[in-house]
Curated annotation (Swiss-Prot):
GO terms for molecular function: enzyme activator activity; lyase activity. Signal peptide: none annotated. Involved in regulation of actin dynamics. InterPro entries: Aldolase_TIM, DeoC, DeoC/FbaB/LacD_aldolase. Homodimer. Interacts with ADF; the interaction enhances ADF activity in disassembly of filamentous actin and inhibition of actin polymerization. GO terms for biological process: carbohydrate catabolic process; deoxyribonucleotide catabolic process; deoxyribose phosphate catabolic process. Its main location: cytoplasm. It comes from the Eukaryota. The gene is DPA. It is found in: Cytoplasm. The lineage of its organism: Eukaryota, Sar, Alveolata, Apicomplexa, Conoidasida. GO terms for cellular component: cytoplasm. This is Divergent deoxyribose-phosphate aldolase-like protein. Keywords: Cytoplasm.
């Protein structure tokens, strides 16, 4: 019979499989980023690390020489951070530079302040920003950070999510990890509804426009829940909500990520590595 400890280890292993650790504070250095990357790349490796663009070249060209295991994790460059007030041109250039340096994915913050001030104008700015950045990102993954904790009300969160989807977002991310409020169940609920309704509209558009060529379908879109430095139990609650809201088929890396801080990553690792069953080794397969 499974014990409480086994359930905890199973939960930690599951969360590690979808985890992205953030190293985005103003005080980050090559040394601090290296420490985060090395723990991120331990077996079983997490999805990746989110960093400012200035650190992408260091990770991809220098750190991998002394820690080759780091080559196995994704590097996501966070652009338009931390204020979210850049123009589409400047943010696109920032993304281009990060991609040239070796970034695998881009994480783009919206102008949440403008969204609060004038919703209609904020929506237009989100669509334009996301569409322009997506042009340079191309087939690589573009996550759009909605800063749900900063947006003033459920309607604004929903409209920001829809605008990001219409601009071409590959992932909707609840928050940046830098604000006072990270993911909430309410924000995840609203984003899930926005995504489901968008997928229905897009499928109907494809049907009505007669786009019936083989393989025609709405692009794959995911949700990233940024939890900050909460504990494993709270993070597991978001995993269960994701399954409840979007179904078990949504729990794949192309559709689901969990973002968090270094302390949460260490807690997940410590729990997983506490396995002590005699004669039994934990499964380390991806």
């Amino acid at each position: 019979m499974a014990t409480e400890q086994i359930y905890k280890q199973f939960t930690s292993r599951t969360l590690l499989n979808f985890f992205e650790v953030a190293a985005l504070t103003d005080g980050e250095t090559n040394e601090s980023v290296a420490a985060v990357c090395k723990i991120a790349a331990k077996d079983p490796a997490i999805v990746g690390v989110s960093v400012r663009p200035a650190f992408v070249r260091f990770i991809r060209q220098e750190l991998v020489k002394s820690a080759p295991e780091v080559a196995g994790i994704k590097v996501c460059a966070a652009v338009n951070f931390p204020e979210g007030t850049g123009t589409p041109d400047t943010v696109s250039l920032e993304a281009v530079g990060a991609l040239k340096d070796g970034a695998d994915e881009i994480e783009c913050l919206i102008d949440w302040r403008r969204m609060n001030e004038n919703v209609a104008d904020g929506e237009s700015r989100i669509r334009l920003l996301v569409s322009e950045v997506k042009k340079v990102v191309g087939p690589k993954t573009l996550k759009v950070v909605l800063s749900g904790g900063e947006l003033q009300g459920g309607d604004i969160i929903s409209r920001a999510a829809v605008a990001a989807l219409e601009g071409g977002a590959d992932f909707l991310q609840t928050s940046s990890g830098l604000g006072a409020t990270h993911a909430t169940m309410f924000t995840v609920h609203l984003i899930s509804i926005a995504l489901r309704e968008y997928m229905v509209r897009e499928n109907e558009r494809i049907r009505v426009e007669g786009i019936n060529r083989e393989g025609a379908a709405v692009r794959c879109i995911g949700i990233k829940i940024e939890v900050g430095d909460v504990h494993m139990a709270e993070t597991a609650d978001f995993l269960m909500q994701m399954i409840f809201e979007n179904g078990p088929r949504s729990i794949v890396r192309d559709k689901f990520r969990v973002g968090g801080g270094f302390n949460l990553l260490k807690e997940l690792r410590d729990c997983y590595e506490s396995w002590d069953s005699v004669g039994v080794s934990p499964d380390t397969s991806p």
